[in-house]
């Protein structure tokens, strides 16, 4: 939730944050928490699969946790591409005065295996980021 403006909005609407350092294969309580929040509030699940802001040309593989959540909860995934890396780089770097584009992409239906899901998600988001750059 540490993305300027967008992160503040996510916090304001009551989004939950998954602390990567505390999440292990043995500690699956966060699945229960996520499932309860989604079912009670009818809110979407938003995952930042890179787990950090990246520079515009960075094509690092997405984290496997996104696929794990998708598979465990058996839910639709609505990919969102945000090109904020060129405006708000990581902490300590100079910010620029430019426009950020947020693109909501075609949903990915449940049922894909983890590898196919990650490949589909990466292709969807990265092709959109190339377009909105």
Summary of predicted features, one role per range:
Residues 28-133:
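Non-catalytic C-terminal accessory region of glycerolipid acyltransferases
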């Amino acid at each position: 939730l540490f993305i300027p403006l967008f992160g503040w909005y996510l916090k304001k609407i009551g989004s939950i944050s998954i602390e990567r350092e505390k999440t292990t294969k043995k500690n699956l309580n966060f699945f229960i928490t996520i499932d309860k929040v989604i079912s009670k509030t009818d809110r979407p699940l938003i995952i930042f699969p890179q787990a950090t802001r990246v520079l515009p040309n960075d094509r690092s593989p997405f984290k496997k946790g996104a696929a794990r959540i998708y598979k465990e909860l058996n839910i639709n995934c609505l990919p969102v591409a945000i090109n904020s890396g060129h405006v708000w780089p990581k902490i300590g770097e100079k910010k620029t005065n430019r426009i950020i584009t947020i693109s909501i992409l075609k949903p990915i239906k449940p049922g894909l295996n983890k590898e196919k899901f990650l490949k589909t998600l990466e292709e969807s988001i990265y092709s959109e980021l190339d377009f909105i750059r």
